Amino acid sequence: MKSIYRSLGKIHVCYSAPLHTSVEDHWVSATFASPTNKPITERQPTMIDREIELQTKDGAMNTFVTHPEEEGPHPVILLLMDAPGKREELHDMARRLGTAGYYVMLPNLYYRRVREFKIQESSREVMHEHMASLSNAMICEDIQSLIDFADEESAARDGKMGCVGYCMSGPFAFAAAAKFSDRIAASASFHGVYLYSDKEDSPHLDAEMITGEMYFGCAETDEYAPKKMVDGLENYLRGTNLNSRIEWYPDTEHGFVFPKRGDKYHKKSAERHWERLFAMYRRCL
């Protein structure tokens, strides 16, 4: 396993206990497990799920929101969808973050073109058209709308927030960390594409603006995020003061974190991805 650290100070990596969740309608009960795998029954948070219509200058952005019912306000985390779109699989991932004590927002980034996108019912060409319609600047405008909404929510805590992107949204999470450096204190990209490129808006160009922590989780075999791209990013970041980490996940392919990705799913690595996220958010938020 190859792990590369770039930090202004020492990073202490901690491991989160697994969460076991059961979902029924819009209410979630969670039982936490201790490092010894003995249930901790003292705290079983009730989760609130809802869909909101968040108004932006380009229209209504349907967004899934989940957070614990009590003990708020909670730090905000923005979970940015991958190319197949906002779906129940991602809702469950948002819930897993939320049960740890976060206010999680999952927006439909394709809202300018379609309210719901289901890859099973559409061709990959349509998906690629949706992807090509987006830009880092557009997504940052959407994130500003998400921040504005969260700032008015009593269950959402003001101040430092987190972000995570997958696949196509990896560069969005990278760009957002720079654009909103006063708010985003911890951001992560998993099997992110175009993190380092010759595009005019390549997110690596603004890396020096990031004041928070940045994590990049990379699949060992990834035709969409090849080693050459990641190596270029690594070399570039060596010349910056960005508090960052690039970590390779052995024996994995693009999409390894998603349980419904068939044989691409790699459970051990997917759990490590959760450990890295929870540890970073605990450190920074």
Predicted regions and their residues:
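N-terminal cap/leader regions of alpha/beta-hydrolase-fold enzymes
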Residues: 5, 9-12, 21-26, 32, ...
